[in-house]
Structure formats: C-alpha cells, structure tokens
Regions:
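Zymogen propeptides
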Residues: 1-169
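Short, ordered beta-strand-loop transition motifs
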Residues: 95-101, 181, 246, 314
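C-terminal soluble interaction/assembly domains
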Residues: 251-253, 260-292, 300-302
Length: 329
C-alpha cells in the first residue's frame, strides 16, 4: 500500500478518473507460454523430494462465468523444474466479465522443492537483526523468485515478528503469513500469543481473505480500512495475494484491474483454503523470477510496473524470496 496511508492526493484521484482500467476489449497477444527454467538443487544423494511423486497438478483456473475461454486461459504451464519435477506453474485468467483486456497471473509453488524466506525492508518494517533487506550472499546465487509482501505497518492492522523480535506487535485474528526455519510457508488467522518453536517470521496484513475455503463476506465492502486505500479510491487496481492449498502448495496471485472480490475469486479458483491480500497498487505489486547464474531478474508479466531489480539492492519494503529447497539459502 502506498505511503500516504488514509490520505489520497487530488492528483491521484484525477489521474485515475482520466485513466481507469478500460472495459471490454481483448487481451493483446493472448495467453503467453513461459519457458520453464531448471532451478539448482543439491545433487549429492537422493532427496525426499525427488523420491516422492509430489503433489498433484492443480485443476485449471475457472474462467469468469459468461466468458468464452481464450486459448490457454486458466491452464497451468510449467514455470520452473527441479529434480525432474515441476516446482512452479503459472496460469492466467481475465479478472471478470468487464475488464476483459487484462490478465491476472496465479503462480503455484511446490514447498517440497522450494523454500520461502521473508526479508524486512529498511523502512517497512525497519531493520531486523540477522535479516537482510535485499538478496545477497548465498541466496542471491540460487534465488528463483521474489514477490511483494503486505501494506505499510500503519495500514496493515497487524504486526511483524522475525528472528524473535516483535518489530510491530502481532494481533490476534489478523491474517498471517507464517514462515518456518525449514522454509515452509502457511497462511492463517493468528491464534494469539507468541510464535511456536520453529517459526522464524510472521507477517500480518488485514483479516483473512479466504478462511477454510470460504471468501470473506466483506470483500465488497467500500470501507477503505477493510481492504486498503487505493489510488483515487478506486476498486479496480493492481492487487496481490497469497494462499495455501489443502496439499500445502502455495499460490500467489498478482494482476491489474482487480477488486478485492476478483482477487479472492482467483485465489479460490487456484484451490486456496486460506488466503490473504498482500500489497496493492501498481507501484508495489510484482512477481519476479531470476535466471542463474547471475540472478538476472525478469518481471513475470511485461505490464508490471516495479523495476525487476528492485530486490537486488536494499528495499524499503519487505518481500519474500523463493529458492530451491536444500540450497541453504
């Protein structure tokens, strides 16, 4: 969420009024087919991940009712491979029946093959002992992807806890992205109290968007405190969110012309049992992949606004890095 908190400038309102997401139209170029990359994994000895068949491929995303599917729309395509298995997939759908020239991307990730690390920003939430605000060291040489985290803490209605330090106190009931020392990630309503042993980070943002497979009743609320202040107080903007499926796989959605309701629908279509909204507005939302060696960054889609190299130097905002499991990143 942008740094103005509850104040949206007159210029932003005018800009949105002059250039809102267009209605109708078609997707320029259609659904892209990504070229999957092979992510580095240890080669010494058999791994549990390579020995098991892994989670089943998710069902295709549901195209909004009333739209004839585009070629490839909603179909999962391989994005990364590890140990001969698909480590990540991506699928795209149009957000609704009105904004038909836009696509929302959903990335599916297998935690048996990938691990997740939360990085604090220099300003959001501020410095955390033992944690870097950029990709560096060994992680930089193996990182496969990064994605944005949540709102500024003053707007998040929740807290930030990492490496034993409550930078901002955790709030019971808040939607929480919980990361463990083994690189696992879960999404839950915080039960209260201190994090359990093995938890290394908790990032909270608003209430749950999806709770036990049910979309929050307030997704159509016009109260900006519920789901965040958008540029020009607009409903249809760039949004992002994260969810975890019943099999433990992780899904991240990101795209333009999204309302809270259509973001929730995309995550639910991807099978999310629990999900939360992450940051919103075009300047803050992105999913970035990296080619190795060299951590060469690429935005997942060309319409993303933030620079692809935003996390290769100190970041003001916190973010999540994704690396191959077993690389020690």
């Amino acid at each position: 969420m942008h740094g103005l908190g509850g104040v949206v400038t007159w210029m932003e309102q005018v800009a949105y009024a002059l250039n809102p997401p267009r209605s109708g139209g078609t997707v320029a170029g259609g659904i892209e087919t990504p070229t999957p990359v092979s992510v580095s994994t240890p080669t010494a000895g058999p791994s549990t991940a390579s020995a098991s068949p892994g989670p089943a491929a998710p069902d295709p995303l549901t195209v909004p009712a009333g739209l004839a599917p585009l070629s490839g729309e909603g179909q999962w395509r391989s994005l990364a491979m590890a140990n001969g298995r698909t480590a990540a997939r991506v699928a795209q759908i149009r957000p609704d029946t009105v904004h038909t020239s836009y696509l929302v991307s959903v990335v599916w990730m297998d935690p048996q093959l990938l691990m997740f690390t939360l990085h604090p920003g220099t300003e959001v939430p501020g410095a955390v002992p033992g944690a870097m605000s950029q990709l560096g060291g060994a992680e930089r040489s193996v990182v496969w992807a990064t994605f944005n985290s949540g709102f500024q803490m003053k707007d998040a209605r929740g807290g930030y806890w990492q490496n034993g330090q409550a930078v901002v106190p955790l709030s019971a009931g808040a939607a929480s992205m919980v990361l463990t020392s083994s690189g696992r990630l879960s999404v839950m309503a915080w039960p209260g109290g201190e994090p359990q042993a093995g938890v290394v980070a908790v990032r909270q943002n608003l209430p749950l968007l999806i709770d036990n497979g049910v979309i929050a009743a307030s997704v159509n609320s016009t109260v900006t405190a519920d789901w965040g202040k958008t540029l020009g107080n607009a409903a249809y903007v760039w949004r992002s969110g994260i969810g975890v499926r019943a099999d433990g796989t992780v899904v991240v959605a990101c795209g333009p012309a999204l309302s809270v309701a259509s973001l929730a629908s995309a995550l639910l279509s991807a099978g999310a049992q629990n999900a939360m909204e992450l940051d919103i507005n075009k300047d803050w939302t992105s999913f970035i992949t990296y080619d190795q060696p060299g951590a060469v960054p690429h935005r997942l889609t060309a319409d993303q606004v933030p620079a692809a190299n935003r996390y290769l130097s100190p970041s003001k905002r916190d973010f999540v890095a994704v690396a191959p499991r077993g690389t020690g990143a």
